[in-house]
A protein has these predicted regions:
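Face-selective signature of the C-terminal outer-membrane beta-barrel domain
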Residues: 3, 292-316, 342-488, 511, ...
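Short acidic/polar hinge/loop motifs at secondary-structure boundaries
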Residues: 64, 143, 169-195
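N-terminal periplasmic accessory domains that precede
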Residues: 89-95, 105, 137-140, 174-175, ...
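Outer-membrane beta-barrel signature, preferentially recognizing the C-terminal barrel domain
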Residues: 346, 451-454, 494-497, 525-579, ...
Length: 769
């Protein structure tokens, strides 16, 4: 840690004599602010570069401790550069004039996504670029460097699933990305090393900002999507809002239907006193539908203060799943049994509720951001396994599992200018109460009732200061957690615990000519989910059970990262050390070694290094995006049967192309390829990839849009993995119902984005639930 602090201090050296601060704003000739303009300081002696920055969304810039008499230069594509000699003045107003000779070139290059490095991450400008024409926010995120589209969401490479904010408000429902139109998005920022103001369990953040809401009156948009694969899926949404002066009312109502088909082949080898091997094939079908509702209100008290409320009420229909599992079992290489298992599963849900209250304001020079959340959900899970055995006794196993979750969370953040920088202080509090009961009438596994209560209070502080050649940000977060575990109504002292941790963070961002760089360190954590902590045992088959582990420790993660950007080229490298890494594991039943119990355990450490190289130029109507990613871990895994060296890197490549033909026609082609390698306690044993193509045509001045899309055209999105645990080796090959034809129709009338500014609290805790 001391060495890292020394490196960061050296990274920021270079203070000048006769220095003072200089700030100002850059406008065009119509007095509109110009964001992302380059503002640099040059030496008066030889015009060498000293320090530089880019303007914020409001056109503002700020330099601390610059030398008087040097030259300030402001420039932006399509405008004549502006220069002035620094004198004893502040709050400069700079007006850039259009460069008539460059206007034609600007028309050609104006579609290029514009990237810039911020004090937290890398921001991609969407407004007035080709990305604003893609359709939805989902489509935009698939084209943002550093983000990878996965089956169930998005991933920041080397960090995992990010927390997503829209206008500072925590995203609660993934369908918000489907409902948000690309034409309403201003920018997307990817933060791969979050600071202290975020929960320590948050390892990556995506911040989406929309264009400023304008105009009064009523507006709505309707979106209908039809998905045809082996099954039919539907997504139907209507969004509305009414705005009058300082008041805004808004709502969203939608229905989605998801049908799935998931075939797989699995082999498990268990080496105890007998060598057991199971080879089974599985065919699973599912049906899931839900009706979602969101309503809310926002009131602007004045130009600096607003309050709001949002309420979400969802009505999930019964989740229905059926499967056929056919397995052959051998013992020491000799045939033991053939078992056909017919499984049915029904999940019944109570309506889930979520409410958010917020206040965002300013009193004098102090910024205030307060949020309070409440969440409730409940589900019942009834499963029946009918096992038909050729050589042994056939049997039927039923189970009932009930879960109920309640969460209360709040967060307060205060910001104030201090010593030429900005100081943010605050605290976040969460309280969770989870009840989890499991019963098996046939007593093949024990019935139990668990209750988990956890409280977490986390004060934090963060300070930002502009030095002569870098922006320095330092933060500290302290989290105190109290966890109580109850089983069958009795408090279990040895599985309950209290602990506290400090999570420091520090980063430095600078610009040298056109090269932008950022070096950062952050300590994070990963907390086990409540299912991973539950001691309840669930039935898989007569050879396989699953349960949590109340003795799991939290991970403590050290991350160092370096990012750089030059024009349309981005590069990043990071080192990650996960102490007490949480992984899947297996244990054998003490009474019958043929029965394995899947659970979780902690490994001492998993160290990884991740790299990223991205290119995103614009060539006429064509905008290609190429990204190469590599992740390599160092892990020597010791089991009771063997020692494994799991050090082979995983490579991932993506190549996206967008063609803007004009007159409302847009063609998009996306592809990716993942190569085999090692990950945690296993390996990816099958290369996989996908090719998607979409064509969009807009009508009626972009109010009506028709889109045709084909996903996974060659049906190559197949996964294969192998895992190694204490006495068991498991290999699985899975195929997804991913080849689809999608038809989407969108109509919008008098629409503009919501002004709602609630950010929410306790999001990491919601994810654990």
């Amino acid at each position: 840690m001391e060495k890292l602090l020394l490196i960061l201090l050296l990274f920021c050296t270079g203070l000048r004599a006769n220095a003072q601060s200089v700030s100002g704003k850059v406008f065009d000739e119509n007095k509109k602010p110009i964001p992302y303009a380059n503002v640099i300081i040059l030496s008066a002696k030889d015009s060498t570069f000293i320090v530089g920055t880019t303007t914020a969304d409001d056109g503002s810039f700020n330099f601390k401790e610059v030398t008087l008499g040097n030259i300030l230069k402001a420039s932006f594509v399509g405008y004549e550069p502006f220069t002035t000699v620094l004198s004893n003045q502040d709050n400069l107003t700079i007006v850039l004039k259009e460069d008539a000779k460059m206007m034609k070139e600007v028309v050609v290059k104006g579609n290029a996504p514009l990237h810039k490095m911020t004090t937290e991450g890398i921001q991609t400008n969407i407004e007035n670029t080709i990305l604003s024409k893609l359709g939805t926010c989902e489509d935009v995120l698939a084209h943002v460097p550093g983000l990878t589209k996965k089956k169930d969401g998005y991933e920041v490479f080397g960090r995992g699933t990010p927390i997503i904010y829209i206008n500072g408000r925590q995203m609660r429902d993934a369908t918000e990305l489907e409902r948000l139109k690309s034409s309403d998005i201003k920018s997307v920022e990817v933060i791969s090393n979050p600071g202290s103001r975020y929960n320590a369990a948050v390892r990556a953040v995506v911040k989406i900002r929309t264009k400023k809401a304008v105009g009064d009156g009523f507006g709505f948009d309707v979106r209908s999507a039809y998905y045809q694969s082996e099954n039919v899926d539907l997504s139907e949404w209507v969004n509305w809002k009414y705005r009058h002066k300082r008041l805004e009312l808004f709502g969203a109502h939608g229905y989605s239907l998801d049908n799935g088909h998931y075939p797989s082949k699995t082999t498990t080898v268990v080496q105890t006193d007998t060598l057991w091997q199971q080879d089974f094939t599985q065919e699973v079908t599912q049906r899931n539908s839900i009706f979602k509702n969101t309503v809310g209100a926002d009131y602007q008290l004045n130009d600096s203060n607003s309050v709001g409320i949002k309420y979400m009420l969802n009505f999930p229909h019964d989740f229905l799943l059926s499967g056929i599992l056919s397995s052959d079992v051998t013992a020491n290489g000799t045939f033991y049994d053939h078992i056909n298992t017919f499984a049915t599963r029904k999940l019944s849900y109570r309506p889930s509720q979520f409410i958010n209250l917020y206040y965002v304001g300013k009193i004098g020079k102090m910024d205030i951001d307060f949020n309070a959340d409440y969440l409730y959900n409940k589900q019942n899970d009834h499963t029946t396994y009918r096992e038909e055995s050729r050589n042994k006794v056939s049997r039927t196993v039923t189970s009932d599992n009930q879960e109920r979750n309640r969460l209360i969370a709040s967060k307060l953040t205060l910001g104030y200018p201090v010593l030429g920088g900005n100081l943010s202080v605050g605290a976040e509090y969460t309280y969770t109460n989870r009840n989890d009961t499991y019963s098996n009438p046939e007593n093949y596994v024990p019935s139990s009732a668990a209750q988990l209560k956890e409280s977490n209070i986390a004060p934090f502080m963060e300070y930002k200061h502009q030095l002569s050649i870098c922006q320095l940000t330092a933060g500290l977060r302290w989290e105190a957690v109290r966890f109580n575990y109850y089983e069958n109504g009795q408090h279990i002292a040895n599985q309950s615990r209290s602990f506290s941790n400090l999570f420091p963070s520090i980063s430095a961002a600078t610009q040298i000519g056109g090269l932008q760089m950022q070096l950062s360190y952050a300590a994070r954590t990963r907390r086990p989910s409540y299912r991973q902590l539950s001691n309840n045992v669930s039935y898989g088959n007569r050879f396989l059970m699953q349960s949590g582990n109340p003795l799991l420790q939290h991970e403590y993660i050290h991350n160092i990262s370096l990012g750089a950007m030059w024009k349309f080229i981005q590069f990043g490298i990071s080192y990650n050390d996960r102490r007490h890494a949480i992984v899947f594991w297996s244990e054998q039943d003490s009474h019958n070694s043929a029965i394995s119990r899947i659970t979780n355990t902690n490994l001492p450490s998993i160290k990884t290094i991740s790299t990223q190289l991205a290119f995103s130029p614009t060539i006429g109507i064509w905008t290609p995006e190429f990204t190469a990613l590599m992740k390599k871990q160092w892990l020597t895994l010791h089991t009771s049967t063997k020692t494994y060296k799991l050090n082979k890197p995983i490579w991932q490549f993506s190549f996206n192309n967008t063609f803007d033909f004009g007159k409302g026609w847009l063609l998009s082609m996306e592809s990716y390829y993942i190569k085999r390698g090692d990950a945690e306690i296993g390996s990816v044993v099958r290369n996989s990839g996908s090719v998607d193509i979409s064509l969009t045509k807009s009508f009626l001045k972009d109010r009506l849009a028709l889109r045709i899309r084909g996903t996974d055209l060659f049906h190559t999105r197949k996964e294969g993995g192998i895992s190694y645990t204490e006495s068991m080796e498991t290999q699985q090959i899975s195929t997804y119902d991913s080849r689809q034809f999608v038809l989407t129709v969108t109509y919008k009338f008098n629409t503009s984005r919501s002004k709602y500014k609630g950010t929410g609290a306790g999001q990491a805790e919601k994810n654990r639930l």
